[in-house]
């Protein structure tokens, strides 16, 4: 089976390059499409900050996340069609985006700590609820 419309769930970490490389290896032979989705930190979780600072912090986090995605895409050596920056529960956004854009494969990373432990929980929810195939890639960190 070949996949032509792939959604890759990435985090703002170097290991995301491994996920995108896996997607490229699957998409390139069939000239498939790749899109990225990531979870941005929501400054509202830092409730000790004053309300006016939250919007500024949200904007900075959005810009940093977009810059990371831009660099990831630049280094991919393959075109990326769309990027999605989500807030909140990643698995819900993945399922919604899959339905809306008709992805036929979701690629997620499996890591034992930090962001990816949360992402792997999201991956479990995606696997349980997904209507498309999900590839869980073991990640090697430095």
Curated annotation (Swiss-Prot):
Task: Supply the InterPro entries for this chain.
Answer: Rossmann-like_a/b/a_fold, Universal_stress_UspA, UspA
Cellular component GO terms, alphabetical: cytoplasm
Against Pfam families, the record matches this protein to:
Usp (PF00582)
- Report keywords, A-Z: Cytoplasm
Provide the coiled-coil residue spans.
none
Localization per record: Cytoplasm
Family as reported in the entry's similarity comment: Belongs to the universal stress protein A family.
The task this protein performs is described as: Required for resistance to DNA-damaging agents.
What PANTHER family does the entry give? STRESS RESPONSE PROTEIN NHAX (PTHR46268), UNIVERSAL STRESS PROTEIN C (PTHR46268:SF16)
Protein known as: Universal stress protein C
Q: From the UniProt record, report the name of the gene that encodes this protein.
A: uspC
């Amino acid at each position: 089976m070949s996949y032509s419309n792939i959604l890759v769930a990435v985090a703002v970490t170097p290991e995301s390059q491994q996920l995108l490389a896996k997607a490229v290896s699957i998409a390139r032979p069939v000239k498939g499409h790749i899109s990225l989705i990531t979870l941005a930190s929501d400054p509202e979780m830092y409730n000790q900050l004053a309300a006016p600072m939250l919007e500024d912090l949200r904007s900075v986090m959005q810009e940093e996340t977009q810059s990371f995605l831009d660099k990831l895409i630049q280094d991919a050596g393959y075109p990326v069609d769309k990027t999605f920056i989500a807030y909140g529960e990643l698995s819900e956004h993945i399922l919604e985006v899959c339905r809306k854009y008709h992805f036929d494969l979701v690629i997620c990373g499996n890591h034992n700590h930090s962001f990816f432990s949360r992402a792997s929980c999201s991956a479990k929810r995606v696997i349980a609820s997904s209507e498309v195939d999900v590839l869980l890639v073991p990640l090697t960190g430095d």
